[in-house]
Amino acid sequence: MYTSGYANRSSSFPTTTHNAARAATENAAAGLVSEVVYHEDQPMMAQLLLLPLLRHLGQQSRWQLWLTPQQKLSREWVQSAGLPLTKVMQISQLAPPHTLESMIRALRTGNYSVVIGWLTEELTEEEHASLVEAANVGNAVGFIMRPVRAHALPRRQHSGLKIHSNLYH
């Protein structure tokens, strides 16, 4: 998972998911953009990492926006995941350029505690900077979900922290 600026904010690393969620929410005052890189054949790993944080952010009065490529979130899954059904919004079937643009606009508004978007390609430095600036303005958290094939390796890494889900087997 890639975090912009978040990794350098605290000298101690929270040891529990609850503490991590609380720390992320407290630090969201400056905005946060993270990239979650996961194997296409192991999407559950990304869910295990994100659901505690999403549940915690769901306690805010703001919406959670999911920008999904094709999949539609089911009411049953949202409820079973412990997410607030009344605060989850979804827009599906967006092309990648529209997903990035929509993420930037949504993050900037401040209406969303978290904006989650799926992108297949790595971001340019300019695109990443635009997302970070928008998250800071809107006091929001943005997650870029990027599935990769098992044999694909990242070409480069932004300065920050990137945790690949295959490290958690």
UniProtKB/Swiss-Prot annotation:
Region (FtsZ binding) residue spans: 106-112
Site feature (Essential for degradation by Lon protease) residues: 169
Domain of life: Bacteria
GO biological process assignments: division septum assembly; DNA repair; negative regulation of cell division; SOS response
Pfam families cross-referenced by the UniProt entry: SulA
Keyword Coiled coil: no
InterPro entries in alphabetical order: Cell_div_suppressor_SulA (IPR004596), P-loop_NTPase (IPR027417), SulA_CellDiv_inhibitor (IPR050356), SulA_enterobact (IPR047696)
Coiled coil: none
Post-translational modification as stated in the protein's UniProt record: Is rapidly cleaved and degraded by the Lon protease once DNA damage is repaired.
The keyword Plastid appears for this protein: no
Family: Belongs to the SulA family.
Subunit annotation: Interacts with FtsZ.
Name of this chain's protein: Cell division inhibitor SulA
Organism in which the protein naturally occurs: Salmonella arizonae (strain ATCC BAA-731 / CDC346-86 / RSK2980)
